[in-house]
């Protein structure tokens, strides 16, 4: 007999194998999975957080999750729920996700925590280039290939790279390249 814990483990393993359609990492490593629950009849509810409101990949992600989780033994049905509270932030990206993004030329801000909890905040717009490590970089365009990314340019190696937009924890708005 398969236990509820065993089924939920299988569900989580399945989620870890579902890639984000726009970024080179899984939805788990990207930090989209907020919760997984199952009732006594095998109905699974998965709560996901979108990176940005209006992200065009939401339907594709929900369809992939529903299809793959529903195919698991002992799962009767799967429902996906998108919620906006708590808001997704780049702090949710796992170390494996950060490494995968960096390997593909996408930088991610360091985990910030609560910016109001410390004294002086020193900020720089210089983002380390994922290709050469130089901080001689600049914002090339606030509009990247998706709503959650910007295009940066490295003056040292003369390569462009993508950067995940930072979210303002106060109002949820994005700011391009504010490292």
Stretches found by the model and what they are:
Residues 1-16:
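N-terminal presequence-like segments and adjacent domain-start helices
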Residues 11, 51-76:
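Short, non-transmembrane amphipathic alpha-helical segments
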Residues 22-49:
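Short edge beta-strands and adjacent turn/loop segments
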Residues 53, 127, 152:
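Cys/His-enriched microdomains
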Residues 129-132, 154-157:
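Short cysteine-rich clusters marking metal-coordination/redox-active sites
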Residues 134-138, 162:
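Short functional micro-motifs and their immediate structural scaffolds
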Residues 141-151:
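Short linker/helix segments within small regulatory modules
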Residues 156-173:
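Short metal-binding segments enriched for Cys and/or His
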């Amino acid at each position: 007999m398969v236990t509820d814990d065993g089924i939920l483990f299988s569900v989580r393993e399945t989620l870890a194998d579902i890639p984000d359609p726009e970024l080179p990492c899984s939805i788990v490593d990207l930090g989209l999975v907020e919760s997984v629950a199952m009732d006594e009849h095998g109905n699974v509810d998965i709560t996901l957080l979108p990176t940005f409101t209006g992200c065009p990949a939401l339907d594709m992600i929900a369809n992939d999750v529903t299809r793959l989780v529903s195919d698991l033994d002992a799962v009767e049905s799967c429902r996906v729920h998108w919620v906006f509270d708590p808001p997704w932030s780049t702090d949710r990206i796992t170390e494996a996700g950060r490494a995968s993004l960096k390997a593909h030329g996408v930088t991610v801000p360091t985990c910030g925590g609560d910016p109001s909890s410390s004294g002086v905040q020193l900020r720089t717009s210089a983002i380390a280039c994922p290709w050469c490590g130089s901080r001689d970089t600049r914002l090339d365009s606030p509009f990247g290939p998706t709503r959650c990314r910007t295009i940066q340019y490295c003056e040292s190696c003369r390569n462009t790279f993508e950067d995940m937009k930072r979210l303002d924890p106060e109002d949820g708005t994005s700011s391009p390249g504010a490292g």
